[in-house]
């Protein structure tokens, strides 16, 4: 019997912007690149691709993804997995975005789930990274017409 438990990073932020603007910023490849990473993202269920940035110690800089859920202006989810030589036994998580209209804007919720005990370094990096990334997301959304 497998009793392994996993953890999740959850970051929520209220943004004084429209659902449409936030949705565009989390689903359109050029906008994603402005606040997250270079990518070949398409918000189509089943689409597979990569997010990538310069490599650093302990990481080749590439994250594989597959889009799992697309509900326009409401929910987006995709896998977020180690790539290349790091894939075997590497990080295998799911990123889920939930957008909810609230007075004066949008409640943005990002959850990256599936961190195992051996993923502690990735978990800590994700906690730091997603807080920073949501700040960058809000900066990009504020520039959209």
Give residue spans per PLM region.
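Hydrophobic/aromatic beta-strand elements that line small-molecule binding cavities or substrate pockets
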Residues: 13, 63-69, 93-100
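Intrinsic-disorder/low-complexity, polar/charged segments enriched in Ser/Thr/Lys/Arg/Asp/Glu/Gln
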Residues: 6-12, 48, 62, 75, ...
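A short, structured loop/turn motif at beta-sheet edges
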Residues: 19, 68-75, 98-107, 142
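Glycine-rich portal/gate segments that line the openings of hydrophobic small-molecule binding cavities
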Residues: 41-82
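Hydrophobic pocket/interface hotspot
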Residues: 22, 32, 49, 67, ...
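Beta-strand/loop substructures that line and gate deep hydrophobic ligand-binding cavities in soluble
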Residues: 83-131
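Short, highly charged C-terminal tails/helix-capping segments
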Residues: 139-145
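Hydrophobic ligand-binding cavity/cleft-lining segments
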Residues: 1-40
